[in-house]
Amino acid sequence: MNRKVLIPSLLLTLFLALISQSGKASADECLNDMKTRVKGKENCLAIHTFLTVSEVKPSTLVIFIHGDQSDGGPVSGMIKLAEDVDVPAGVIKIALLRPGYFDKSGNTSSGTSWRRKDSYTPTNLDEVTSAVQSLQSHYQISKTVLVGHSGGAAYAGVMIGRSPGVANAALLLSCPCDIRRWRAFKKDAPWSSLSPSSFAETVPTTMKVITITGEYDDNTREYLAQDYIETLAKRGVSAEFRRAVGAGHNDIVRGDVIDEALRILLRLD
């Protein structure tokens, strides 16, 4: 046997084993304090929690889910939005980092982002859905609103149809609501990501959904959200498309763009 081949092979096996054990440990040893970390199905997801000091018992969760952040940098925009946007007393705002992402402070969600491409997988959707359900149970929440931007909007759109009851309402910003058509437009194929359009028929008719796409969004074009909303509306879901005048794909993540829509979705019966 050639020892020169055997030794590198053994080293590679040990290296891969260490990586596997490290990833498992990060999930098993999750702090899970429901303020900075929450356990998903198998992974430990970083979160930022914003709760206004009030005598009112918390009754509503607003979960902010960021986009793909394709520049490879830290997640920041949706965390700032979650911190800044005004909500009534009794509303807990939580910005959640998708599997494999990190923020400016180095807080990281375990799992994989699939190089920030094609990452709306069943496994990742299960992680985020499980995390939301854990937060609901911990805070004994009766109402939940999902706010997603771009890839985060795809997450939210899939979740409300794939896991009916996970939320009462969803605000989808710059939504690539039909992944097949979005990928075709971007000339990206093949893909494995789940699409909100594939789950439109199972979104509960009790849901409230608002999509907002920027007038100058050259990434997730308006028709992707418009057609999705039309499908929901035909089924009797309270669904509305809005155009953000003068806004592009990323600068739609601003309080002045979403304030009114979020107020509407928070007025849940």
Where are these regions (language model features)?
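N-terminal cap/lid segment of alpha/beta-hydrolase-fold proteins
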Residues: A25-V53
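Short, surface-exposed "cap/lid" segments of acyl-processing enzymes
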Residues: C44, V53-V91, A95
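Cap/lid segment of the alpha/beta-hydrolase catalytic domain
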Residues: L97-Y120
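Alpha/beta-hydrolase active-site loop
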Residues: T112-H138
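Gly/Ala-rich beta-loop-alpha elbow adjacent to hydrolase catalytic centers
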Residues: V147-G152, A156
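A conserved short beta-strand
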Residues: G165-D178
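The feature captures the conserved acid-bearing segment of alpha/beta-hydrolase catalytic domains
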Residues: C175-E240
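C-terminal catalytic histidine-bearing segment of alpha/beta-hydrolase fold enzymes
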Residues: Q226-D269
